[in-house]
Curated annotation (Swiss-Prot):
Coiled coil: none annotated. Keywords: DNA-binding, Phosphoprotein, Transcription, Transcription regulation. Residues 98-114 have a biased composition (Low complexity). Phosphorylated. Phosphorylation increases protein degradation. One of its GO terms (biological process) is DNA-templated transcription. The modification Phosphothreonine is found at T153. GO terms for molecular function: DNA binding; DNA-binding transcription factor activity. InterPro entries: BES1_N, BZR. Residues 6-88 are annotated as: Required for DNA-binding. This is BES1/BZR1 homolog protein 3. It comes from Arabidopsis thaliana (Mouse-ear cress). Belongs to the BZR/LAT61 family. Residues 85-97 have a biased composition (Polar residues).
C-alpha cells in the first residue's frame, strides 16, 4: 500500500456500503416497475446503462454503443465531415435555415436610389437645374409703390452683378420723407409714405381719418412739430388742438377730458346717476 493514500475509517466504509445498498434497492424497484407496467424485458441483474437505452428507444431516441444519443432519423454530422467542409445535413437536423428576408424593393424613383435602381436617374434633375438657373432676377416681380410693408426682395439664384441690380421706382423714392425735428436714427431716416394718408382730410382737421407719423407706417397720430402747445403732453399744430380733442378744447377747464388724460367723451352730457366710473365728479 502506497504511503500517499489515506485508509478510510470503519465508519466511512459502513456509510459507503449503506449508500450503495440504498441505491441498489431503489434501482430494483424501478426495474420491477418497468417490467410490470412498461413491458420492458430486463434481466434480473441488469446494468443501468441498458435500462437507459431501453427508455430512450421507447421515447424515440437512438443510443449507439459508444453512447451517442440522437432522435431517430436525425443523425448529426460527423466531426470529420465538418472539418472537411461537408454541408450535407440530415433530414431532421436541428439546424434551421433562416427565413427569407422580408425585403420588398420600393418602386423605382428618379431622385432616390432604390434596390432595383441603386444609382437613381441623375439625368432627370438636369432640366430642373437648368430651369432654375435660367430664371434671372429680372423676371421675378418687384413690389414697390404705395405699400405699408417693406419691398419684397426676390430670392436670387446666383450672386447679383452690376447689370442685375434693380433700381427702385422713382415714385417710391419720392414717398420717403426725413423729419426735421426727429432724432437721427435709421427708423426716421427712410420712411415710406402711408398710402392711406389723405392730405385733404388732414387740412380739414378730420380726426377720424388716418394720419402719418414719422418712423411709423399705418394709421397713427399726425406729425406735428414740437413747441406749439406747451400745456399738452403731445405737441399739436395750430388749429388742430380743438379738432383733435374729443369734444371742445375750450371747455377743458370745465372738466372736459383730453384724449391723453382719460376716456373719450362725446358732446352730449351724461347724468351723474348713469356714470360708471369709480369716483364721482362732484366729489373730485
Amino acid at each position: 500500500m502506497t504511503s500517499g493514500t489515506r485508509t478510510p475509517t470503519w465508519k466511512e466504509r459502513e456509510n459507503n456500503k449503506r449508500r450503495e445498498r440504498r441505491r441498489r434497492a431503489i434501482a430494483a424497484k424501478i426495474f420491477a416497475g418497468l417490467r410490470i407496467h412498461g413491458n420492458f424485458k430486463l434481466p434480473k441483474h441488469c446494468d443501468n446503462n441498458e435500462v437507459l437505452k431501453a427508455l430512450c428507444n421507447e421515447a424515440g431516441w437512438t443510443v449507439e454503443d459508444d453512447g451517442t444519443t440522437y432522435r431517430k432519423g436525425c443523425k448529426p454530422m460527423d466531426r470529420m465531415d465538418l472539418m472537411n467542409g461537408s454541408t450535407s445535413a440530415s433530414p431532421c437536423s436541428s439546424y434551421q435555415h433562416s427565413p427569407r428576408a422580408s425585403y420588398n424593393p420600393s418602386p423605382s424613383s428618379s431622385s432616390f436610389p432604390s434596390p432595383t435602381n441603386p444609382f437613381g436617374d441623375a439625368n432627370s434633375l438636369i432640366p430642373w437645374l437648368k430651369n432654375l438657373s435660367s430664371n434671372s432676377p429680372s423676371k421675378l416681380p418687384f413690389f414697390h409703390g404705395n405699400s405699408i410693408s417693406a419691398p419684397v426682395t426676390p430670392p436670387l439664384a446666383r450672386s447679383p452683378t452690376r447689370d442685375q441690380v434693380t433700381i427702385p421706382d422713382s415714385g417710391w423714392l419720392s414717398g420717403m420723407q426725413t423729419p426735421q425735428s426727429g432724432p437721427s436714427s435709421p427708423t426716421f431716416s427712410l420712411v415710406s409714405r402711408n398710402p392711406f394718408f389723405d392730405k385733404e382730410a388732414f387740412k380739414m382737421g378730420d380726426c377720424n381719418s388716418p394720419m402719418w407719423t414719422p418712423g411709423q407706417s399705418g394709421n397713427c397720430s399726425p406729425a406735428i412739430p414740437a413747441g406749439v402747445d406747451q400745456n399738452s403732453d403731445v405737441p399739436m399744430a395750430d388749429g388742430m388742438t380743438a379738432e383733435f380733442a374729443f369734444g371742445c378744447n375750450a371747455m377743458a377747464a370745465n372738466g372736459m377730458v383730453k384724449p391723453w388724460e382719460g376716456e373719450r367723451i362725446h358732446g352730449e352730457c351724461v347724468s351723474d346717476d348713469l356714470e360708471l366710473t369709480l369716483g364721482n365728479s362732484r366729489t373730485r
